[in-house]
Amino acid sequence: MFRIGQGFDVHQFVEGRPLIIGGVHIPYEKGLLGHSDADVLLHAVADACLGAIGAGDIGRHFPDTDPRYKDADSAELLAHVWSLVRQEGYVLVNADCTIIAQKPKMAPYIEEMKKVIARLLEAERSQVNVKATTTEKLGFTGREEGVAAQVVVLLQKSEA
């Protein structure tokens, strides 16, 4: 059996925070605002995985009203989500990830993001695609107010 999940997340830029996207620290003058480390890409991956197994969203599992998740490492949150996926008996077929940001340029960091996501999802790098696009200076991402990410995952019931 196959299951598809789709995830989407948005965070706004603020001064004084590190910029972490896809588990990679990116040198930039601003970071993303959030209760956790605000890793917009890993949040979208987590939501896609949760959606594929019908388990709600990251807000339900890691509420921003819970102090345990203040400044949480999103890689740890995704690792927990992946353990739920594995408990349901699924493995990753593939993940297709899109980062939407005017700045900074993501190209230098894409391969490392793929490596991080593949490791967290117990997959090969070839099963994870990460790409970035701009909105041609339109909307909040175009005005450099924040970053968005969308992710689609395909899971398959494990034979093991």
Swiss-Prot record:
Pathway: Isoprenoid biosynthesis; isopentenyl diphosphate biosynthesis via DXP pathway; isopentenyl diphosphate from 1-deoxy-D-xylulose 5-phosphate: step 4/6. Gene3D superfamilies: 2-C-methyl-D-erythritol 2,4-cyclodiphosphate synthase. InterPro entries: MECDP_synthase, MECDP_synthase_CS, MECDP_synthase_sf. It comes from the Bacteria. Keywords: Isoprene biosynthesis, Lyase, Metal-binding. The record marks 35, 134 as: Transition state stabilizer. The keyword Transferase does not apply. Its EC number is 4.6.1.12. It catalyses: 4-CDP-2-C-methyl-D-erythritol 2-phosphate = 2-C-methyl-D-erythritol 2,4-cyclic diphosphate + CMP. Pfam families: YgbB (PF02542). SUPFAM superfamilies: IpsF-like. One of its GO terms (biological process) is isopentenyl diphosphate biosynthetic process, methylerythritol 4-phosphate pathway. The keyword Secreted does not apply. Its cofactor is a divalent metal cation. A divalent metal cation binds at residues 9, 11, 43. Transmembrane segments: none annotated. 4-CDP-2-C-methyl-D-erythritol 2-phosphate binds at residues 9-11, 35-36, 57-59, 62-66, 101-107, 133-136, 140, 143. Binds 1 divalent metal cation per subunit. Belongs to the IspF family. Homotrimer. This is 2-C-methyl-D-erythritol 2,4-cyclodiphosphate synthase. It comes from Geobacillus thermodenitrificans (strain NG80-2). The lineage of its organism: Bacteria, Bacillati, Bacillota, Bacilli, Bacillales. The gene is ispF.
